[in-house]
Amino acid sequence: MTELHQIVKRMLVTEKSTLEKDEKNKYYFEVDRRANKIEIRKAVERLLKVTVDDVHVINIKGKKKRTGRIIGKRRDWKKAVVTLAQGNTIDIYHGV
């Protein structure tokens, strides 16, 4: 994986992630399913110009969804919880 924007797809902003950001300096990202912790760490450090302390990865199975008699499935995806070094922050509301 060479493209940094292919590894880190988007930042996840939820109620839980906002609390973790304020209390523990943790940020949540949706990442490529093939990416490993080392690639995620390097991508976040280069894209956002911060120092990463720790990376936790969670594989999330897609839910089964039903419309009438047709049963479908949402895609599987990977979530990364990135802990930044003390003193580093990411301004997620910049320009809003």
Swiss-Prot record:
| Keyword DNA repair assigned | no
The record lists the membrane-crossing segments as none
Q: How does it assemble?
A: Part of the 50S ribosomal subunit. Contacts protein L29, and trigger factor when it is bound to the ribosome.
- According to its UniProt record, which protein family does this protein belong to? Belongs to the universal ribosomal protein uL23 family.
**Origin species:** Syntrophus aciditrophicus (strain SB)
What's one GO MF term for it?
Answer: rRNA binding
Cysteine pairs bridged by disulfides in the record: none
Annotated keywords:
Ribonucleoprotein, Ribosomal protein, RNA-binding, rRNA-binding
Q: Which gene encodes it?
A: rplW
Q: Which GO terms describe its cellular component?
A: ribonucleoprotein complex; ribosome
Matching entries from SUPFAM superfamilies are given as: Ribosomal proteins S24e, L23 and L15e (SSF54189)
The organism that produces this protein has a lineage beginning with:
Bacteria, Pseudomonadati, Thermodesulfobacteriota, Syntrophia, Syntrophales
Q: Highest taxon of the source?
A: Bacteria
The cross-references to NCBIfam families, in alphabetical order and at most eight, read: PRK05738.1-3, PRK05738.2-4, PRK05738.3-2
Q: What does this protein do?
A: One of the early assembly proteins it binds 23S rRNA. One of the proteins that surrounds the polypeptide exit tunnel on the outside of the ribosome. Forms the main docking site for trigger factor binding to the ribosome.
What is this protein called in UniProt? Large ribosomal subunit protein uL23
